[in-house]
């Protein structure tokens, strides 16, 4: 049995990995020269199982209106009459109801927890080095209102069996000593001990080598020209490297999956939500984060690698615009300077932007399509690194028949109505 996977970001890569483990002869196609050269390249570095939450949440519509007027707001919207964006935004607003939020978060937590198990097993079986740490995530709050608002999430964490700890300011400092100088800015925190961190790009390079050793073929610098169909199935994929034929095909091209599937008459509600990051070399380890610190006010994550800090945040609805405006640089720079002002050499900060493939409900699209041998694994938003291993394993189970056809409503058919 043969499989073709389109896309070698972390999600496509793990789709290929688990398909080869299931016995498939796998070929991966990517337009870049290496795996993870696009959205997986410089993400936040969080593997945030407990923080797997949809952006569509109660109160977000009101917050979004306020954020439009703030200089360092976590959400920015570039005015547009793009019908895809308007439809996506309408669907997202519909998912801000509490009942929908609870369903969506429960789905996301289920995938994330499964992914934790898969990544743990992967580390046990293979010697992979990606500057990973298993030291949890600390979400810090700056207002009493934020402390109260987090209770609804804590209830869902309890339902899913996710471990957590409410923390006073003193406990936050004990967990992250680098915050001591700014303790007066904090009101408390929420600590999730089972969360992890790691450089997604390094992980992908390691996994590419492992996959190649297991017989997976990678066609880099190769563009997908056309997906060819006959009846209700795919018969081949036309690429720069020629025609590829397989028994099953997987679209894992992140935000670019939408346009490819549209050519086949398949509509998916995945929109590119632009995110930004900066990477700072550490100059004083005692002043740097130990693991990941989440700033609830600005929705920015600060993650420790070995000798670097990765700072990532901001959601911008601007289509596929690759520009990095100075205002976005200022926002993420402000947060790291505010919380860890003496941690790194900010003059050497490297900025990056990527397009997160976001669905309106936050839950990825994993599973079947109207074409019987075509599958999707996309739409993970900010959680591609968190969910990649679990999503890849789950997809392989769906394809091989080990798993139900539509576990927890994860495939695109939940949008059929």
UniProtKB/Swiss-Prot annotation:
It is an enzyme of class 1 (oxidoreductase). InterPro entries: DadA, FAD-dep_OxRdtase, FAD/NAD-bd_sf. GO terms for biological process: D-alanine catabolic process. Its cofactor is FAD. It comes from the Bacteria. One of its GO terms (molecular function) is D-amino-acid dehydrogenase activity. The keyword Manganese does not apply. The keyword Oxidoreductase applies. This is D-amino acid dehydrogenase. It comes from Vibrio vulnificus (strain CMCP6). The gene is dadA.
């Amino acid at each position: 049995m043969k499989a073709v996977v389109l896309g070698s970001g972390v999600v496509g890569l793990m789709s290929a990995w688990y398909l080869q483990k299931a016995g498939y002869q796998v070929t991966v196609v990517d337009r870049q020269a290496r795996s993870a050269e696009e959205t997986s390249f410089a993400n936040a570095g969080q593997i945030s199982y407990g923080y797997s939450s949809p952006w569509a949440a109660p109160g977000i519509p009101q917050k979004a209106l306020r954020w439009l007027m703030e200089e360092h707001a976590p959400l920015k919207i570039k005015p547009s009459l793009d019908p895809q964006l308007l439809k996506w935004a309408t669907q997202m607003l519909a998912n801000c109801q509490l009942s929908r939020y609870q369903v969506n978060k429960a789905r996301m937590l289920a995938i994330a927890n499964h992914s934790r198990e898969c990544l743990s097993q992967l580390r046990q079986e293979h010697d992979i080095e990606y500057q990973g740490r298993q030291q949890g995530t600390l979400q810090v709050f700056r207002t009493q209102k934020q402390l109260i608002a987090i209770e609804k999430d804590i209830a869902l964490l309890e339902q899913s069996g996710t471990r957590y700890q409410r923390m006073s300011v003193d406990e936050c400092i004990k967990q992250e000593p680098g915050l001591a100088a700014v303790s007066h800015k904090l009101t408390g925190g929420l600590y999730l001990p089972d969360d992890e961190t790691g450089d997604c790009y390094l992980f992908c390079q390691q996994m590419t080598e492992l996959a190649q050793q297991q017989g997976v073929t990678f066609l880099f610098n190769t563009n997908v020209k056309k997906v060819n169909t006959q009846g209700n199935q795919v018969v081949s994929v036309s690429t720069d490297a020629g025609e590829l034929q397989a028994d099953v095909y997987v679209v894992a091209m992140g935000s670019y999956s939408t346009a490819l599937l549209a050519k086949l008459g398949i509509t998916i509600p995945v929109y590119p939500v632009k995110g930004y990051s900066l990477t700072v070399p550490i100059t004083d380890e005692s002043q740097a984060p130990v693991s990941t610190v989440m700033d609830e006010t600005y929705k920015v994550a600060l993650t420790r690698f070995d000798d670097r800090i990765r700072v990532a945040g901001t959601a911008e609805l601007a289509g596929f615009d690759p520009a990095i405006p100075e205002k976005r640089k200022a926002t993420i720079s402000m947060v790291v300077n505010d919380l860890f002002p003496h941690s790194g050499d900010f003059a050497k900060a490297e900025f990056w932007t990527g397009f997160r493939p976001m669905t309106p409900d936050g839950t990825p699209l994993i599973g079947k399509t109207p074409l019987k041998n075509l599958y999707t694994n996309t739409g993970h938003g900010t959680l591609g690194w968190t969910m990649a291993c679990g999503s890849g394993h789950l997809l392989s189970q769906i394809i091989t028949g080990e798993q139900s056809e539509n576990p927890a409503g994860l495939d695109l058919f939940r949008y059929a109505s």
